[in-house]
A protein has these predicted regions:
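A short, surface-exposed alpha-helical micro-motif characterized by mixed small hydrophobic
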Residues: 204-206
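Conserved small/polar residues in nucleotide/adenosyl-binding loops
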Residues: 168, 317-324
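A short, flexible loop at the N-terminus of ABC-type nucleotide-binding domains that lies
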Residues: 1, 10-23, 73-76
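Conserved ABC ATPase "signature" region
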Residues: 67-68, 104, 108, 115-132
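Helix-to-loop junction immediately C-terminal to a conserved catalytic motif
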Residues: 52
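Short coil-to-helix segment of the ABC ATPase nucleotide-binding domain corresponding to the Q-loop/switch region
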Residues: 97-104
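Conserved signature/switch motifs of ABC ATPase nucleotide-binding domains
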Residues: 136-139, 157, 164
Length: 328
């Protein structure tokens, strides 16, 4: 549905050229909620602007619905953009206008008949649960309500792709969760493919099925959320994952184990998906004849799957030559 292949983009800066994107490739399939995560300056916003044709490439290709954007003329590009909705970090609403006017604006600009506009605005207001706010001025709304208006506006053209640029970063945690649930509902009930950028791994954890990690204009890691969370490879990915799944062994636990008379090494056991149902620790005790004490554990839900990380001390006499990590 969305293919970015070997994309390169540079900008002229005060101190010379800035390489915003370097050989970036991603593939978003129909029905995905695909997250692009990275710190500021990683190239996330540039990438998403390429997908809706707001930026052009130096080299590489961007293909949406089988159409290579670089080969389209302006009328063709405008037609394609009608199927792509956009949700912004700072809402981009007309504060002095009503909720109705803001949502209707894309249809007004397209000269859609008034009766059709009324019908569509009513439909999307019901979907985003703002029916009672139709005649309220945007300036009177909360941040979460403003973002719902922004989402409703993006849905008026019946898009099959929704691009979200840090759509929750200006919101409090409770409102963020509500907006993410709404995006998931849009994906599930409307069949809209979502490409979102964020610097919050919790956002990826809650709704994405795939993720690409960006650093300094490059995609350093990409794959299913389960794979990336379960086996992060790049250092920046590990830092992001640790904000959600803390599998680091605290110094206090290491010190506690060192105080014991026996010599122990602290180990991690990681269980993903159906393996959480298996009595692995019980089997270790039975087969190896050792006593295991669980010093710590974390449990996270990832796309209807469970990932558990256990921290436990094991006697040196029963250790393998390498660290235990059971990705079962």
């Amino acid at each position: 549905m969305i293919k970015v292949e070997h994309a390169n983009k540079t900008f002229s800066g005060k101190y010379g050229k800035v390489h915003a994107l370097q050989d970036v490739s991603i593939h978003v399939e129909k029905g995905d909620i695909y997250g692009i995560i990275g710190f500021s300056g990683a190239g996330k916003s540039t990438l998403i602007r390429l997908v809706n044709g707001l930026e052009t490439l130096d080299s590489g290709t961007v293909t949406v619905h089988g159409e290579e954007l670089g080969s389209l003329k302006k009328p063709q590009l405008r037609k394609l953009r009608r199927k792509i909705g956009m949700v912004f970090q700072q809402f981009n609403l007309l504060e002095s206008k009503t909720v109705y006017h803001n949502i209707a604006l894309p249809l007004i600009l397209e000269k859609v008949p008034k009766a059709e506009i009324d019908k569509k605005v009513k439909e999307v207001l019901r979907f985003v649960e703002l029916e009672d706010k139709k005649d309220v001025y945007v300036s009177q709304l909360s941040g979460g309500q403003k973002q719902r208006v922004g989402i409703a506006r993006a849905l008026t053209t019946t898009p099959d792709i929704l691009l979200c640029d840090e759509a929750t970063s200006a919101l409090d945690p409770q409102t963020t969760e509500a907006i993410l649930k709404l995006l998931k509902k849009i994906n599930r009930e409307m069949g809209v493919t979502i490409l979102l950028i964020t610097h919050q791994m919790q956002v990826v954890q809650m709704i994405c099925n795939k993720v690409a990690v960006m650093e300094k204009g490059q995609v350093v890691e990409a794959g299913s959320v389960l794979d990336v969370f379960g086996k992060p490879q790049a250092p920046v990915t590990k830092r992001f994952v640790q904000t959600v799944v803390n599998d680091q062994i605290p110094e206090s636990i290491i010190s506690l184990v060192k105080e014991q008379k026996e010599h122990f090494r602290v180990e991690r056991l990681k269980f993903i998906g159906s393996s959480v149902k298996r009595p692995v620790i019980s089997d270790i005790c039975h087969v190896e004849g050792i006593v295991v004490n669980i010093l710590g554990a974390t449990v996270q839900e990832l796309q209807d799957n469970i990932m558990c990380v256990f921290i436990l001390p094991v006697s040196y006499t029963h250790l393998r030559a390498h660290e235990t990590e059971a990705d079962l």
